[in-house]
Amino acid sequence: MRILGIETSCDETGIAIYDDEKGLLAHKLYSQIKLHADYGGVVPELASRDHVKKTIPLIKEALKEANLTAKDIDGVAYTAGPGLVGALLVGATIGRSLAYAWGVPAVPVHHMEGHLLAPMLEDNPPPFPFVAVLVSGGHSMMVEVKGIGEYKILGESIDDAAGEAFDKTAKLMGLDYPGGPLLSKLAEKGTPGRFKFPRPMTNVPGLDMSFSGLKTFTANTIAANGDDEQTRADIAYAFEEAVCATLAIKCKRALEQTGMKRIVIAGGVSANRRLRAELEKLAHKVGGDVYYPRTEFCTDNGAMIAYAGMQRLKNNEVSDLAVEARPRWPIDQLTPVMK
C-alpha cells in the first residue's frame, strides 16, 4: 500500500509518499520562513495562499522522485487539524479532491498524532507503551501512549507552548524570526550558572506546565543586567535550561505515574539538543530508553502524515466526501487502531 501524505497545518508545505513494505519513497518540504520573516510571525492568510501555490507542484515532484504515477497511489492522507483553519483547508481540499479523482480513499489525520508517530519512521522505532513528550510551537503535553489512538493526556501547558515561549523570548531579545533555533544557538555561548531561572509549576503536584512567565522573567533579567552580547548569551542559556529542566521534571513524574520507562520526544522542539540530553539522562536513570525522529522529521512534514494515515486506512477509517478541517482537536478524542 502506498499513501500520499499532505501537511499544510501552519507554515510548511510537506508532501511524502510512504509504502508499507518499502518505507518512505519520497519526501518534499517547503518552508515559508522567508515569507513571514518581515512580520515576525506566521500570517495565516499568507500561509494559506502559499500552500495553494506549492502543494500541487510538490505532489508532482514527490511522484517523480518515487518514480510513480497517480495510478500507483492507494490512498491520500491529509492533515485535518489542529492548525490554522485556512491552511488546513488548502491541504484538506486538495487531498480530498485528488482522492476522489484517483478513485482512492482519503483519510483525515491528526497533526499531533503525526508528530507522535514520527519516530516510527526510523530504523529503531519505539515499541508500545511509552510516555510521549509532545513539544512544538502550538502544543506542549505529556501523553500516555498504549497504542496508536490510545492516548491519555497526563498534562499540558496552560498558556504558551514550549516552542511558542522560545520564539516569543527570542523576539524579546531582538533575535530574527524564527527565533527559537537562534536562541538555542546563542545559548551555546552562554555561561552556566550566571543566571538561575525558575522552573514553572514544578513545586506543585501534577503534570500541567506553564512557560509564559519565563518571558517576563527574561525581560526583567535583561532590564537589570543590560543586554551586551555575553549577557544575552547567558540569559539565553538560563532560559533554555529552565524550559528543558521543567520538561524533564514533568516527564519524570509522568514515568512514575504510569510505571513506564520508554520516552518519545516529538514535535519541533524535539530537535533541541539540550532537551534530548536531559531526557536521555532521565531515561538512563530509570533504566529506560528515549526515542526521537531525525531532525528533518521533528518539524512539520508530510512523511509523518503519510505514515499516520496509513495506520488509519488499515483500520478502515475512510472519510466521506466532506472536507474536514479542525483548528482545535484534542488528541485524546482519537479512536484506537485495532491490533
From Swiss-Prot:
EC numbers on record: 2.3.1.234
SUPFAM superfamilies assigned to the protein according to its UniProt record, in alphabetical order? Actin-like ATPase domain
Q: Could you name the domain of life of the organism this protein comes from?
A: Bacteria
What is the free-text note on the cofactor?
Answer: Binds 1 Fe(2+) ion per subunit.
Question: Which terms does the record give in the GO molecular function aspect?
Answer: iron ion binding; N(6)-L-threonylcarbamoyladenine synthase activity
Q: What is its main location?
A: cytoplasm
Naming one, the record's GO cellular component terms include: cytoplasm
Q: Which cofactor does it need?
A: Fe(2+)
Primary enzyme class:
transferase
Localization (cell):
Cytoplasm
Q: Which InterPro entries does the record cross-reference, listed alphabetically?
A: ATPase_NBD, Gcp-like_dom, KAE1/TsaD, Peptidase_M22_CS, TsaD
| Reactions the enzyme catalyzes | L-threonylcarbamoyladenylate + adenosine(37) in tRNA = N(6)-L-threonylcarbamoyladenosine(37) in tRNA + AMP + H(+)
Residues annotated for Fe cation binding in this entry: 111, 115, 300
> Matching Pfam families, A to Z?
TsaD
Residues reported in the UniProt entry to bind substrate: 134-138, 167, 180, 272
Name the family the entry cites: Belongs to the KAE1 / TsaD family.
HAMAP family of this UniProt entry?
TsaD
- State the protein's purpose: Required for the formation of a threonylcarbamoyl group on adenosine at position 37 (t(6)A37) in tRNAs that read codons beginning with adenine. Is involved in the transfer of the threonylcarbamoyl moiety of threonylcarbamoyl-AMP (TC-AMP) to the N6 group of A37, together with TsaE and TsaB. TsaD likely plays a direct catalytic role in this reaction.
* Protein's name according to its UniProt entry: tRNA N6-adenosine threonylcarbamoyltransferase
Origin organism is: Vibrio vulnificus (strain YJ016)
Instruction: Name the gene behind this protein.
Output: tsaD
